[in-house]
A protein has these predicted regions:
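Accessory beta-strand-rich segments of carbohydrate-active enzymes
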Residues: 22-31, 35, 46, 60-64, ...
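Bacterial Sec-dependent N-terminal signal peptides
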Residues: 1-21
């Protein structure tokens, strides 16, 4: 059985530099390798599903307030994440002590400058210091015996705050 390493970086309101067009600043790029949206209904042969596994649990996690502080090569299979924290998934960053909770009943907590998302907000805004937080997650897992013979295997994310990329075994496989 192969061991798979699943990684994803979550980019909130993301851009890495104002001069470069990134996927999250291009309104024509809403996804890469994503299946069409649909209801999450999965038939099972038995009460305990034999065609899905849950990856909820403890993941390795690293949070940064700005993209420039992220680790760009964190997705490589030989990357050492021993200094990263153990983080529950699913979970909210702010509830777990990373970043500042933002509640806006009207308006936006960031500078409106489409398609750029890193414009400097007002000094009093929370996003002035946490311009574009990035969460990086890592987890290793094994597919059950026989799954590779099935052909395709799908990942389903049931809640992500904003844009994210997914890597498996060091290879970028998607963006949403």
């Amino acid at each position: 059985m192969k061991i798979y390493t699943l990684l994803f970086g979550l980019l909130l309101f993301s851009q890495l530099s104002a001069q470069t067009a990134h996927d999250w600043e291009n309104h024509h790029v809403l996804q890469i390798n994503r299946e069409p949206a649909r209801a999450a209904f999965t038939p099972f042969h038995a009460q305990k599903g034999d065609c899905s596994i849950c990856l909820d649990g403890t993941w390795k996690f690293r949070w940064t307030p700005v993209p420039d502080e992220r680790i760009a090569e964190f997705y490589q299979t030989d990357f050492n994440d021993k200094d990263w924290v153990s983080f529950p998934v699913p979970a909210n960053w702010e509830v777990n002590g990373y970043g500042t909770p933002i509640y806006v009943s009207a308006g936006y907590p960031f500078k409106i400058d489409p398609p750029r998302v890193m414009g400097e907000p007002k000094v009093g805004y929370t996003t002035y210091k946490e311009r574009n937080p990035v969460g990086q997650y890592r987890r290793s897992f094994q597919l059950p015996a026989g799954w590779e013979a099935r052909g395709q295997t799908f990942l389903r994310f049931e809640g992500v705050m904003s844009a994210f990329y997914v890597w498996i075994n060091g290879e970028r496989v998607g963006y949403s």
